[in-house]
Amino acid sequence: DNVYFARSALNIGKENLFKYYKNLKIGEKIPFELALNRSQYINKNQKVNDQFIADSGYGQGQILMNPLQLASIYSSFVNEGSIYQPHIVQGKTKTWIKNVFSKETSQTIKEDLINVIADEKGTGHSIYHDNVTLAGKTGTAEIKQSQSDTTGTELGWFTVMTTDEKQPILMTTVVEDVKNRGGSGYVVEHTKAPLDLYLSQE
């Protein structure tokens, strides 16, 4: 809920919010075999006020996330608070950022992400599986020129992962122009087929 996250960001405050952005290496080079665009949380010379902090709290404002970095951040919730380093070739995974979240915080968020899919009212419930525990989060990013712009488009996001080391997968899917097509729910439905295929092969 945008209101919840906006209020949370205001309660956290600019100093702590920006500190966590930096802890997550948002804006820094992503360690990867190929060149990637950097994520960002603020433009240069941006005036920071309560409206900006509130918008940033629910992923709007000037936040631009590289999908690979977002997927890496989600890995911390099944890795006791440490973020895995992304890589192309399957092999031993290295840790990129250690202990960015506490084990307790990671466990709490993991349980919330599980409910997004396990709960019948969850936004990701349509990909629920009886035989494997899935955790995920949907999101919709508005792309518009100003607060009053009603003609802008939307990006739909969905990240899903298993919590079982025997069936490890983490997928982040982004679909452009999901406005009037079901928002992030449209993305969930298009994530289902590749996820089902992977799980059926295990």
Model features per residue range: what roles?
Residues K94-I97, V188-E202:
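Short, gly/Ser/Thr-rich active-site loops of penicillin-recognizing serine hydrolases
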Residues I12-G13, V178-K179, Q201:
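Noncatalytic linker/hinge segments flanking ATPase motor cores
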Residues E176-E189:
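A short acidic/glycine-rich loop-to-helix N-cap element
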Residues D1-V175:
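Beta-lactam-recognizing serine transpeptidase/beta-lactamase-like catalytic domain environment
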